[in-house]
């Protein structure tokens, strides 16, 4: 899902 992908990206951003 787009939302899930967003969270994944946020995690990688850390």
Curated annotation (Swiss-Prot):
Signal peptide: none
GO cellular component: chloroplast thylakoid membrane; photosystem I
Chief subcellular location: plastid
UniProt topology in membrane: Peripheral membrane protein
Subcellular location: Plastid, Chloroplast thylakoid membrane
Keywords (A to Z) from UniProt: Chloroplast, Membrane, Photosynthesis, Photosystem I, Plastid, Thylakoid
GO biological process, one term: photosynthesis
The protein's role, per its UniProt record: May function in mediating the binding of the antenna complexes to the PSI reaction center and core antenna.
Family note: Belongs to the psaN family.
The protein's name in its UniProt record: Photosystem I reaction center subunit N
Annotated organism of origin: Pisum sativum
Gene: PSAN
């Amino acid at each position: 899902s787009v939302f899930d992908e967003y969270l994944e990206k946020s995690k990688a951003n850390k």
